[in-house]
């Protein structure tokens, strides 16, 4: 006796076709995402290479200008820095209300916390008010990069989130053309048009006590007097390296 052919109910057939269609759509969508991600990675690498060329060109321009000045018997005057990195080196005790408010304004609410500040007439005045409680200076590209990659966190929905990949940066700063961690670094280093948004996105850096200590007999004297506080110009890079 021939086996009877068992027909599947129409609802099952429809579901099977639907599942097959969804599976095809899923595979197509996954393939499209892979292509898009590959293109995005290539674009980011291209932008990073352009940033690197920009940094190198700026360094060469300064070196060439110094050589020309020396050859002509004159002095090269460097452009006024546009960026400082500020580290709070004193706790909350014995800080008057006005400097305390400035520290809060600059988001330096804890000892050993650090933030980037755009140099303007207004911020220069603020730095004078809090000078006895902070160390600051002009960070190099290398210092900014190391800070962001090692200690960088973003402020997302009032939460402190580690910058573990480019997608976090793009999701929060993509509307400003900042698509990757290196784009973020570039915006900070160059004090670009969206510096404010980029800097506000960065959570204040939480640094450690300097390895080997402060190396000064009296911490709360000005840097130029052998202490730790105040403007240490390019020497901020050495301090950050010891605290990072």
Swiss-Prot record:
Gene3D superfamilies from the UniProt entry: Ribosomal protein L30, ferredoxin-like fold domain (3.30.1390.20)
GO molecular function, one term: structural constituent of ribosome
A single GO BP: maturation of LSU-rRNA from tricistronic rRNA transcript (SSU-rRNA, 5.8S rRNA, LSU-rRNA)
GO cellular component, one term: cytosolic large ribosomal subunit
Alphabetical keyword list: Ribonucleoprotein, Ribosomal protein
Family annotation (PROSITE patterns): RIBOSOMAL_L30
Domain of life from the UniProt record: Eukaryota
Family statement: Belongs to the universal ribosomal protein uL30 family.
Protein name (record): Large ribosomal subunit protein uL30
Protein source organism: Candida glabrata (strain ATCC 2001 / BCRC 20586 / JCM 3761 / NBRC 0622 / NRRL Y-65 / CBS 138)
